[in-house]
Amino acid sequence: MSVDQATVRRVAHLARIAVSEEELEPLKGELNAILAFVEQLANLDVADVEPMTGVIPMELPMREDVVTDGHYPEKILANAPEAEGGFFTVPKVVE
C-alpha cells in the first residue's frame, strides 16, 4: 500500500493536525515506511508463538482478600454531615 499526498492531507485533517505543503512529502515518506514495516509484520509466521501480554513473564503477588472495617470507621463517619448505625445518612432521592 502506498500513501500519496492527498492521503497525508486527509489523515492530518482527521487527526486535526495542521500540515504545511513543505511537510507533506517527508510525512508521505514516513507513513510509507511505517506501512511497509506493518506489511512485514503481517507476513511473519507466528503459528508456533504462544500469545503473551508482555515480553517478560511476570506474576504479581496476590494478597489475601480480607474484609475489614477500614480500621478507623469513626474518623470516616466524622466527615459525614449525618451518620446513623455506622452508615452515612443521605437524603431520599427516589420516592
From Swiss-Prot:
UniProt-recorded name of the protein: Aspartyl/glutamyl-tRNA(Asn/Gln) amidotransferase subunit C
E.C. numbers:
6.3.5.-
Q: Which PANTHER family does the record associate with it?
A: GLUTAMYL-TRNA(GLN) AMIDOTRANSFERASE SUBUNIT C, MITOCHONDRIAL
SUPFAM superfamilies linked: Glu-tRNAGln amidotransferase C subunit
Keyword Protein biosynthesis assigned to the entry: answer is yes
Natural source organism: Azorhizobium caulinodans (strain ATCC 43989 / DSM 5975 / JCM 20966 / LMG 6465 / NBRC 14845 / NCIMB 13405 / ORS 571)
Q: Which gene name belongs to this protein?
A: gatC
Molecular function terms, GO-annotated: asparaginyl-tRNA synthase (glutamine-hydrolyzing) activity; ATP binding; glutaminyl-tRNA synthase (glutamine-hydrolyzing) activity
Answer whether the UniProt record assigns the keyword Ligase to this protein. Answer: yes
Q: Which reaction does it catalyse?
A: L-glutamyl-tRNA(Gln) + L-glutamine + ATP + H2O = L-glutaminyl-tRNA(Gln) + L-glutamate + ADP + phosphate + H(+); L-aspartyl-tRNA(Asn) + L-glutamine + ATP + H2O = L-asparaginyl-tRNA(Asn) + L-glutamate + ADP + phosphate + 2 H(+)
Q: What is the protein's quaternary organization?
A: Heterotrimer of A, B and C subunits.
InterPro entries reported in the protein's UniProt record: Asp/Glu-ADT_sf_sub_c, GatC
Protein function: Allows the formation of correctly charged Asn-tRNA(Asn) or Gln-tRNA(Gln) through the transamidation of misacylated Asp-tRNA(Asn) or Glu-tRNA(Gln) in organisms which lack either or both of asparaginyl-tRNA or glutaminyl-tRNA synthetases. The reaction takes place in the presence of glutamine and ATP through an activated phospho-Asp-tRNA(Asn) or phospho-Glu-tRNA(Gln).
